[in-house]
Amino acid sequence: MTKEQFAEVLAAQGISLTDRQKEQFDHFFRLLVEWNEKMNLTGITEEGQVYNKHFYDSITPAFYFPFDQVQSVVDIGGGAGFPSIPLKICFPHLKMTIIDSLNKRMSFLQHVAKELGLENVNPVHGRAEDRGQEAMYREKFDLVVARAVARLNLLSEFCLPFAKVGGHFVALKGAEITPELAEAKKAIKTLGGKTRKVETFQLLEEAGERNIVIMEKIEATPKSYPRKAGVPAKKPLV
């Protein structure tokens, strides 16, 4: 995918990039490749692949969810800034918090935000299980996003506690989502969520199937969730 094709496919979905936004994506690509040489951020570094499998993929939730109607967003397991940074570039009004357990990635994200001139980007070091119990973050966000971090029952425990009641959780998942949805049904309900819709589509250039799972937070998450760090992975809710 060329930079021009990237801009065209977004415009076809109603997201028209300004010259400044196009420059921000180009700068982000260069920073990603540069920093990837000293820390493991991504296995994808070829420009066309980055634009398709990282940038475009990160923005696809906006084809199905109204990002212009939310203010506060948290990206759980945001690592190299996906989906948070592409979404922030496209929707500059967002107040974006990025939580990741690797501190060195926080340095990268802080540098990216500064270099790209992105305001209201807050990288936070920590595990979702810990931060999700803290009053500063718990049930404070209009929207929670996460990209292929874990299976949906586990991911829901990491993410739903951060959403306000009436807010949403959007999970960016790969192929074969039906078994995960069935497996996660009880967990989602227990955590106060309800699956509203699932959108299935193909990434461009035969890069594979993707699924966007959109949940609404309809009840407060019980105080016992998320459980202590490491417990959800060992004993997933089923």
Swiss-Prot record:
Transmembrane segments: none annotated. The keyword Glycoprotein does not apply. It comes from the Bacteria. CDD domains: AdoMet_MTases (cd02440). It is an enzyme of class 2 (transferase). InterPro entries: rRNA_ssu_MeTfrase_G, SAM-dependent_MTases_sf. GO terms for molecular function: rRNA (guanine-N7-)-methyltransferase activity. Belongs to the methyltransferase superfamily. RNA methyltransferase RsmG family. This is Ribosomal RNA small subunit methyltransferase G. It comes from Brevibacillus brevis (strain 47 / JCM 6285 / NBRC 100599). The gene is rsmG.
